[in-house]
Amino acid sequence: MRRLDDTGPHPPIKGAGLRLAVLSRGPRLYSTRRIVEEARRRGLRVDVCDPMKFSLTISDGSVDVLHKGEAFSYDAVIPRIGHSITQHGVAVLRQIEQLGMWTANSGQGILQSRDKLHASQILARNRMPVPKTAYVRDIIDVEHAIEMVGGLPVVVKVTQGTQGDGVFLRHTAFEVRNLVQGLLLTGKSV
């Protein structure tokens, strides 16, 4: 049996001075620490960079990225952009992409993954199985939406959210209508 930390059939990456930046607000988070540990174990030089400490400049034919006032230049970037700073983090990541640095995830990919409806549309377009989904913007469409997805009970989701936030199980049409109405009134997409 192979251990999870086994490098498997792929030879270990030889860092030889390669520089890796991990964009993360939480250097003490387990996932960030593990990325740093593995990168160092493989000989890479790695820094954790807070996405909120970046400045971006754009001029005719030129873009630049500064982190804490210093020029930002790495061979590769692993973004760990939290939901609360998605827009800013993606703006930073897009500028990094413009400079030609390799990124593990694109800014566009992060945005697509944060929108549950858009992610489902992409999966369906690529013939990946997805649960039956209905998107409503008016309370009058709730009954039809329940029928379209196969009846009760239903899972109601807001399109934006991570780690289960904005996901609700409802067993009656009355519960679904009340929930959807409340979410729509607060400006959520359902």
Cite the ranges covered by each PLM segment.
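Active-site nucleotide/adenylate-binding loops and adjacent lid/helix of ATP-dependent enzymes
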Residues: 12-13, 17-25, 30-37, 46, ...
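Short, compositionally biased "basic patch" segments
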Residues: 35-41, 66
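N-terminal ordered "arm"
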Residues: 42-48
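N-terminal glycine-rich "phosphate-gripper" loop used for MgATP/nucleotide binding
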Residues: 51-97, 104-113
